[in-house]
């Protein structure tokens, strides 16, 4: 089954063709990061307009790269939530038009479900059930994946997403947007241990997380040092910040394995590319005797192939949409439209 897939939830326009949920025939991504870096973050209106300009050409490109014609497409999948509403709407509108023109089913895909499914592209042996740690710029979740299209949220951030905090910390340290990779590179220059940063505890919800206090602490450290004319050890702060984020994520992920009785942990999302978090997950899973799947870096960020992968399994589960499908800025992972 050849699925033409679209992802436009933030600042990447991504289109792919995926066969049977596992084989990527072609994929293309147009990033707007350099443009949004001028503003220190994503400007929703600009993102939406750039999606409109790029999506048709990328669609032609992936079909050509895959050696397919439009008649070879069996279904269309698209991210319909969550994300920047204008950006998501561009992808949904184009996907609906494509499905109608081709006379094929339209498959709605939750963005975070797509991130989790990116691992299916890299690991043919991976099958549910497992626990997923989905960490990105807009979402931070622990998910019980009972089956390919049957998932429940076990824990989530109560405020900021982990990736959002990395971007904010990078900005106060004078690093470019997006901040995840520059922060990681800076952190490799220090062993850390210099700055004591707060760790949150959410009463009554042991798998929930909070990153707003950590973000505020880093901002205050940087501003106070500037006001006092003191030198800030940026590499040490970047390292200690990454360790603090990892300290929120990894113990909760391991606890989720205990509570569910699962023996496999899957990481997903852009923040899963962070070297400190990856190393901590590897150590924790080795100690617990759990299997760990870390996505290759190419599948950590937003891409169309992950939507095609999850779209296949949503289709097998009977989840298709009519042409009145809408776009949503927010949506729970387990209670889809």
Segments (PLM) and residue ranges:
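Conserved phosphate-binding/catalytic loops in two-lobed NTP-binding clefts
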Residues: 108-109, 282-307
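Short Gly/Thr/Asp-enriched flexible loops that form oxyanion-binding sites at enzyme active sites
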Residues: 78-102, 275-283
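Glycine-rich phosphate-binding loop plus the immediately following alpha-helix
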Residues: 124, 147-189, 215-216, 220-224
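Conserved phosphate-binding catalytic cores of ATP/NTP-utilizing and phosphoryl-transfer enzymes
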Residues: 1, 109-131, 310
